[in-house]
Amino acid sequence: MKNEFSIKFNFPDGILGFEEIKEFIIKDSEYKPFSIMQSINGEINFLVTSPFNFLEKYLPNIEEKDWLDVQAENEDEKVILCIINMHVKTYKEITANLKAPIILNKKKLIGKQAISTNEEHYLRYRVFKE
């Protein structure tokens, strides 16, 4: 059995489309730099990664209220992830949702899906394309 790193986060508001799911585990994936964000019951899985892995100058313009909702006041508590989509037809196009990032307080283990107010961010930003 391989070692697997995972952390449980509480999402008081759930995430968009899955508001009823309040707890997710974020765990390592064998496909770096991606991680898996999985509901506690294991029924819902998302592939996630830091947007800074592919977009060095990502500026999401997240509202201060959103950071307060996850009780993150200091920069060292804040983590931003984005949900990754692999398009089923070819699996060759990978996009990231930059418009609605997952924000986390890594110390208090609280998360939320926020909305970026930066007009340059799209729901389907091409991360990789063959």
From Swiss-Prot:
The keyword Transferase does not apply. Interacts with translational regulator CsrA and flagellin(s). Acts as an anti-CsrA protein, binds CsrA and prevents it from repressing translation of its target genes, one of which is flagellin. Binds to flagellin and participates in the assembly of the flagellum. It comes from Borrelia hermsii (strain HS1 / DAH). SUPFAM superfamilies: BH3618-like. This is Flagellar assembly factor FliW. Its main location: cytoplasm. Keywords: Bacterial flagellum biogenesis, Chaperone, Cytoplasm, Translation regulation. Gene3D superfamilies: BH3618-like. Belongs to the FliW family. One of its GO terms (cellular component) is cytoplasm. Pfam families: FliW (PF02623). It is found in: Cytoplasm. GO terms for biological process: bacterial-type flagellum assembly; regulation of translation. It comes from the Bacteria.
